Amino acid sequence: MMVDFFNNIEVLPGLHANGELTLGENLADHGGLNVAYLAFQNATKDAPLGVVDGFTPEQRFFLAYATLWAGNIRDEQIRVYTKSDPHSLGRWRVNGALPHIQAWYDAFHITPSDPLYVAPEKRVNVW
């Protein structure tokens, strides 16, 4: 399921991500994100955090994850990395991971009309 999801990502016109090459790292991102979110929930359960700048603690957790992978990369490097790197490009470490995390849907009230929405039966749920 995850291989197909990433194989369908067009990173540049005519160039798709390689879900087979990146499978191990994509699964690691998925698992790590789930474990990190559980740790976040555990760390804040006795001292809940408030809304800051209009964002809930849960939203800020996912925004921090997305910010970690933000960056600019030239098309030439996208081509090289897509063909040789077992890690997905930063953009897809975010936009490829979050749609498989139910807590992200809950935090941002994601619905079927939102661009990154993935139907529950098509989401990867390893943990």
Predicted regions and their residues:
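Zinc-dependent metallohydrolase catalytic domains
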Residues: 1-127
